[in-house]
Amino acid sequence: MTLLIILILKYLLCLENLKNISLQISKNNTINNINCENNFNNINKSYSINESNSAKNDFVKFLKFIFFHAF
């Protein structure tokens, strides 16, 4: 009888551990997904800023070219 109670308690403890592990994995996946989204957003922002700066630089080069060749 004691052995049966011990086995049942071990089984319940195992289930509790599995539940905790599952919750931890779920939390980690959520955190990883948020980090991935933030990294992707940061990459997009960085790319658009660089693209904008590149367009400005090209426009400035174009204006300098016109100015120096006009005079």
From Swiss-Prot:
Which top-rank group of organisms is this from?
A: Eukaryota
Glycosylated positions are N20, N28, N44, N50
First and last residue of the signal peptide? 1-23
List membrane-spanning regions: none
UniProt keyword annotations, A-Z: Glycoprotein, Secreted, Signal
Q: What are the GO cellular component annotations?
A: extracellular region
Location in or out of the cell: Secreted
Query: Protein name, please?
Result: Putative uncharacterized protein DDB_G0291626
What is the species of this protein?
Answer: Dictyostelium discoideum
